[in-house]
A protein has these predicted regions:
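Active-site PLP attachment segment
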Residues: 1-8, 13-27
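Functionally constrained cores in energy, signaling, and assembly domains
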Residues: 12, 20, 32, 286, ...
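Short glycine/serine- and small hydrophobic-enriched flexible loop segments
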Residues: 26-34
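Non-catalytic terminal extensions of PLP-dependent enzymes
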Residues: 35-352
Length: 352
């Protein structure tokens, strides 16, 4: 019953802001009315640009996600006022290699100036391949939380901060100072107990004697071994989508009727998913009810399971699957549709 309650709630709820509700607030609407509202957000854009410039000038490893060059000149060499009103400085140009994205057209995509996206070492942006050493962004995110700065979210090698008019340069300078401090700790290979004291205290036996670079290397090697970035890409490419076997609504009804069974992740291969499964980030369903477990989705969740066991304290949030401990190891379990003969027996009241 508890799992069904959570399933029903998460199907119709989100942790993301509900923007129509925000827009309906009278005070919020008044603040954004007319020229004053546009000026507030222009100030936010300007602060975001200046923060990116500070990071480019003071950090060697953590970089803002913007073009390296614009018309042959460094991004940060232009005046802030010019950058703030010219989309060239936030534009994805086909053929450029600062991001390793592909399959888009001219003027199709732009970086949102109010989303301060930073990248960490570990993936060569020019070819999309893993480098020998990397700093998974979740380690940086935990360091920032330890020091009172909460990022919006992080992925394999990127971390995101949402900028609003509530952010002033003092806050952004504090963020930059922490980024610089993290890089110094990384270069000095500081003891993990100093960098992430909360996680170290919770898992002292596991991380005894660890340094920051040692943790980064171990997590980076895990991602590279499973080629997790490629799995992420494949999960959202049409040619790799899970095969549909049932109407999603019918699969959900089967779940509500109890015509399902909870199985270990390896045993789910080839079975029909009864729940949508979602790792956060990216916060997007990778398999939906009625689809067949397998392929990139199954391999991705298997990699996450290995990471949960290998590196405690860094588990991502998972929805639609369940972490259960057996024989000292945490395992991922999920609900799948029972075979038809088992469902018939269930309807007849037979014991299964």
């Amino acid at each position: 019953p508890h799992k069904r309650m959570n399933n029903a709630f998460m199907m119709h709820a989100s942790t993301s802001p509900f923007y129509p509700l925000f827009a309906a607030l009278d005070i919020n609407a008044k603040m954004h009315e007319g020229v004053s509202g546009r000026n507030m957000w222009m100030d936010c854009v300007v602060n975001g640009i200046n923060a990116r410039k500070l990071i480019l000038d003071n950090c060697q490893h953590i970089r803002p996600f913007v073009p390296e060059l614009v018309d042959g000149k460094p991004w940060q060499s232009y005046e802030t006022a010019q950058i703030a009103v010219d989309l060239r400085f936030f534009k994805f140009v086909p053929g450029e290699h600062w991001h390793s994205f592909e399959g888009y057209a001219e003027n199709q995509y732009f970086v949102d100036p109010c989303k301060l996206l930073l990248t960490t070492p570990g993936i060569d942006a020019r070819n999309g391949e893993y480098e020998a050493f990397g700093v998974p962004a979740t380690i940086l995110a935990n360091f920032l939380r330890e020091n009172g700065v909460v990022p919006e979210k992080c992925d394999l090698n990127s971390i995101l901060f949402l900028l609003t008019p509530a952010e002033d340069m003092a806050k952004l300078q504090q963020l930059v100072a922490l980024l610089v401090r993290f890089e110094k700790l990384l270069e000095a290979d500081a003891p993990l107990a100093e960098v992430l004291p909360s996680i170290y205290k919770q898992h002292e036996e596991r991380y005894a004697g660890y340094t920051l670079r040692q943790l980064c290397q171990e997590m980076h090697d895990l991602y590279a071994r499973h080629n997790v970035k490629q799995l992420q890409k494949e999960m959202f490419r049409k040619e790799h989508f899970p095969r549909v076997s049932m109407n999603p609504q019918e699969a959900n009804y089967a779940y509500l009727r109890g015509e399902v069974e909870l199985v270990r992740l390896p045993d789910a291969e080839g079975r029909i998913a009864a729940e949508g499964a979602l790792p956060y980030p990216p916060g997007v369903l990778c398999v939906v009810p009625g689809e067949i477990w397998g392929g990139a989705v199954l391999r991705y969740f298997s990699a996450l399971e290995e990471g949960i066991n290998l590196l405690p304290g860094f588990a991502p949030e998972l929805q639609g699957v369940y972490i259960e401990e057996h024989d000292g190891r945490k395992q991922v379990w999920c609900y799948v549709i029972k075979p038809r003969d088992a469902q018939s027996a269930l309807l007849k009241g037979e014991k299964l």
